[in-house]
């Protein structure tokens, strides 16, 4: 059918009308939405929209009209109700609760630290509801007693003024807040040999009691030189019913531990030192039996040790067990699970590297942290790295320290126990290392050359060559000892005087000090006299200068370096007067600290000969009072050394004729500690009184 022009015009008009009505419909919809939005600010809800009447087209395009909707009363009411539900009055902005993140942490002193962010006074008001709350203005932090853990948690959870997102303490830490030490005797003299106990300093007695309160499972982390080894032996002796005792230590200090036992426990006559795989272990379990071995031998004898079930074990230098994947750590862990008493010794606990503490903690209490992954996330900034899980950081360090001090660790710095220490302590340290071993043939040849020479002049020349070679060979081991024991990461700030004789030894020490980027001064024979005063002043006043590298002969007199409290002799000298004068650069008027003196000795070197020569030049032993880190007074000290050919350090440091009694007031001597070995074979003289 062909449309006429009139029909086409009519269709076009109707189409335009339909478009117009559709546009009008859309405009009404938009207006209704605008009215609904505007009405949200008024108290009354907006009027419901009128029902939409759809436009229906009939098949005949020439005639179209809207269809009337069919809607009864119930349908209308339902539509209105649905619309009212959709258009709700929003809560005013002023009534929205701020969200505050709150984190609970264990703090030192049986306290729980409360950290929150952002700051809101409402949280302060909540904390103040707890009677035990305390504010530390220095740390700007709030704490409550650990016994109020549940109380503060409930108060924060039920807060109304703010929305609290609470991060509570982990369950294992909550359990630790309830930890109660075991009852221990307040007077050790009632349960142990009084002659042993009276030799301990007060802080050492506290360390023993701390261990007994924890059933002999602790980490003894006192600073080097404070007598960890004698504390460990005293603790172990309390549990003699659970002997034989097993001591695992670095190979170089096995002899030192034996001497400690001979000194303090002469009744113990069955001491087994395991040097090689064929060496036997104790075949009977008695309270007078001790086995001493290196970590390497512990690994080799793992099966035998596990079968014997040692119930009291000392792990010396326990930071050697920091690697959980190392075989020695796995063996030590197996042994510690069977043992009743486990005593760890370390003067350098890695509190800023908590990942290294995990294995040591588990040796003492394997239930405290059962999972390294969880431990690392909370304390090591543990996270998934590009290739593996990484735990190299440090988080919540204060909480970890609080846990360790409460449950398993005791650590005292020299500054903490200064009142208990004598004015000056001396000790001999035997150093060893691959550089010494590698040159042992040369050293033995030099010694043989010295011994076979008859001419006094030639003998002196030969000794000087032997002395020089010894200094060169010792230098690397000396540097390693000084840096590892005094300038390790997190070491307490201290100043150290390092004395040597040969230029090559001084140079080696200077290079290693510079590598560590330690501020230092150097005074030797090449230092102009007018420069010495300025160098000494800078050492005394500049906190960034921590090391003085000094010549025994050139810097041993005429200068004051009392800012240092540690004196290390990398080499010794023929004349004991030079040694005493060098010590007194730090031990003199103006010194407010206890001076700690170390002599670094290498066995089978010229040092052996030098000690004998020093002894021959001394006249009397009298005016030197001795005091070890295990004895409170010199009068009670009687150290013996099995090798009669090896003279004691007490004999080397006798008073020289031109030394006044006042200058020698209270000089003291200290026996071996940890990897240190004292060699004394004479009873202590009486202390000189003014």
Swiss-Prot record:
Record Pfam families: HARP (PF07443), Helicase_C (PF00271), SNF2-rel_dom (PF00176)
Catalytic activity of the protein: ATP + H2O = ADP + phosphate + H(+)
Listed SUPFAM superfamilies: P-loop containing nucleoside triphosphate hydrolases
Molecular function in Gene Ontology: ATP binding; ATP-dependent DNA/DNA annealing activity; helicase activity; hydrolase activity
Residues of the Helicase C-terminal domain: 482-639
CDD domains found in the cross-reference section: DEXHc_HARP_SMARCAL1 (cd18010), SF2_C_SNF (cd18793)
Record-level GO BP terms: chromatin organization; DNA repair; regulation of transcription by RNA polymerase II; replication fork processing
Low complexity bias locations: 31-44
Record InterPro entries: HARP_dom (IPR010003), Helicase_ATP-bd (IPR014001), Helicase_C-like (IPR001650), P-loop_NTPase (IPR027417), SNF2-like_sf (IPR038718), SNF2/RAD54-like_C (IPR049730), SNF2_N (IPR000330)
Binding-site residues, ATP: 222-229
Limits of the HARP domain: 92-170
Location of region: Disordered: 30-49
Family: Belongs to the SNF2/RAD54 helicase family. SMARCAL1 subfamily.
Protein name: SWI/SNF-related matrix-associated actin-dependent regulator of chromatin subfamily A-like protein 1 homolog
Source organism of this protein record: Caenorhabditis elegans
